[in-house]
Amino acid sequence: ERCSPHPHVYTDRVLRLGYFSSQPISLLTALCGNGDRVDLLVVAPGTGIILNNEIDDFSIQPGTPNTYGLIGIDANSIQPGKRPLSSMSPSIIMENDRPVLIVGGAGGPRIISAVLQTILNVVDFRMPIDKAVEGARIHHQWLPNDLAVEPGIPAETRASLERRGHKVRERDNLGVVQAILVRNGKVFGKADPRKQERGG
């Protein structure tokens, strides 16, 4: 199958700061019948180059917030041979040398929170995969110094967080995940309903 760049990757126009921040990440989470598992992004054939907007993870302008509100720092400025800080965290949870949970996500700095909370929902709280993925989330990224919570977080939990000194702010869509759970020899997949395009 042929692979060609997104039409907006090559342009002679000057694009506004943050333009590429709005482009989505394509993520695939899969488990094969023979037990092979993968959590990956798209790679251009024969190049090893991941096709995504990862270059946006560099600080375009140190001291200036990006689309997600992260303040850029000079140490993360774009330079030849450098890798940007990244929140991508495809995860495969193993038990007795077998995959039991495969999780990956999209959503910039919110990816780590979304993936971790999905894993905790399954491993610690023993939730079925659909409830684990759909569960309300929280996210804190240091700057801005507020704790984002989705609408489903109970009022008593919010009040408890505020009593501890957190500045709580309600936000929709704190990351999007795809997950596969293997339990009792059966495979269950779930694509996050926070995203319009669905898989699983």
Explain the meaning of each model-derived region.
Residues 1-4:
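Amphipathic alpha-helical
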Residues 12, 16-174:
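Proteins synthesized as precursors that undergo proteolytic processing into mature forms
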Residues 156-200:
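In a subset of proteins, long, contiguous C-terminal domains/tails are tracked
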Residues 10-12, 182:
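Alpha-helical and His/Cys-centered functional microenvironments
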